């Protein structure tokens, strides 16, 4: 691992609801975090492990970002 990779600062989500831009920035950092159920103004951000759903949150839910950050920290696979 190069030092630049080791010290890379990852973008997380705010503790509450989050925007599409924030979700896209986070999903772009991980191989197993995706935007699904896209209905335009609202969508789900999901974490999967070997195709199995680990956690999902609608972008407008209270505390959505807080819980998503916890599951990404524990299960996220960096690109």
From Swiss-Prot:
InterPro entries in UniProt: DUF905, YkfF-like_sf
Listed SUPFAM superfamilies: YcfA/nrd intein domain
Family listed: Belongs to the UPF0401 family.
One Pfam family matching this protein: DUF905
Superkingdom in the source lineage: Bacteria
Protein name according to UniProt: UPF0401 protein YubL
Organism: Salmonella choleraesuis (strain SC-B67)
UniProt entry keywords in alphabetical sequence: Plasmid
Stored Gene3D superfamilies: ykff protein like domains (3.30.160.130)
Gene: yubL
């Amino acid at each position: 691992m190069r030092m630049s990779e080791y010290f890379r600062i990852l973008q997380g989500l705010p503790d509450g609801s989050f925007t599409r831009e924030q979700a896209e920035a986070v999903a772009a950092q991980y191989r197993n975090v995706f935007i699904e159920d896209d209905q335009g103004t609202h969508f789900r951000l999901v974490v999967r492990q070997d195709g199995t759903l680990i956690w999902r949150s609608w972008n407008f839910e209270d505390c959505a970002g807080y819980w998503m950050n916890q599951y990404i920290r524990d299960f996220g696979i960096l690109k």
